[in-house]
């Protein structure tokens, strides 16, 4: 099997799209769609319990700073093992949820989060394949920035137990990647 193959896995979710303010009937300002990608967390050195809200993630807030409106066009979590994962495998649990969900990363482990999934990274069987888990945009509010603040924007939960033989450097990581539509530029000082 080719170890460079990407495994794409959909998450089960409840279709409950967020509502947004209605747009005025006047001419809209131009919009630009930009890509983004950042490392959300790493695994393999200790127990990891991460909650990453896209609305407040530093790389996203920097990207959206000069605009009044920001809306997710597409987004995915990318689980990437390193070569160290082959000899030191680990299990990662993850789920996309609305930011106002009371779910925690450790609850995915106990299968208490609908759509939560577990992935084995590394080892002899799964080797070092990259796994993509797309965000279902029909289960969260796409608007990250608007005239009001929304509480049901996307949040990624990720958990991994402390490894039996912890590595000094991470054996895997999660990147969040996607595209975001930015509109209505603000006047800002240089």
Swiss-Prot record:
The protein's matches in InterPro entries, at most eight in alphabetical order, are given as: Tymo_coat, Viral_coat
Query: Which domain of life does the protein's organism represent?
Result: Viruses
- Where does the protein end up? Virion
Q: Which GO terms describe its cellular component?
A: T=3 icosahedral viral capsid
Gene3D superfamilies from the entry?
A: 2.60.120.20
Keyword vocabulary terms for this entry: Acetylation, Capsid protein, T=3 icosahedral capsid protein, Virion
What SUPFAM superfamilies does this protein map onto?
Answer: Positive stranded ssRNA viruses (SSF88633)
Residue list for modification N-acetylmethionine: 1
Q: Which Pfam families match?
A: Tymo_coat
> Which family does this protein fall into?
Belongs to the tymoviruses capsid protein family.
Q: What is this protein called?
A: Capsid protein
Which species?
Belladonna mottle virus
């Amino acid at each position: 099997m080719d170890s460079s193959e990407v495994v794409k896995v959909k998450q089960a979710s409840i279709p409950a799209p967020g509502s947004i303010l209605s747009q005025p009937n006047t001419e809209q300002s131009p919009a630009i769609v930009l890509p983004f990608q950042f490392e959300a967390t790493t695994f393999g050195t200790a127990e990891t319990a991460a909650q990453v809200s896209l609305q407040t993630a530093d790389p996203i807030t920097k990207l959206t700073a000069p605009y009044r409106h920001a809306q997710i066009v597409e987004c995915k979590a990318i689980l990437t093992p390193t070569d160290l994962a082959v000899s030191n495998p680990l299990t990662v649990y993850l789920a996309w949820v609305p930011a106002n969900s009371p779910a925690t990363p450790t609850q995915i482990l106990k299968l208490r989060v609908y759509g939560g999934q577990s992935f084995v990274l590394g080892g002899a069987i799964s080797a070092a394949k990259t796994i993509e888990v797309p965000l279902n945009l029909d289960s969260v509010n796409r608007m990250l920035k608007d005239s009001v603040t929304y509480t049901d924007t996307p949040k990624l939960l990720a958990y991994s137990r402390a490894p039996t033989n912890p590595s000094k450097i991470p054996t895997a990581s999660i990147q969040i990647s996607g595209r975001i539509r930015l509109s209505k530029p603000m006047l800002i000082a240089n």
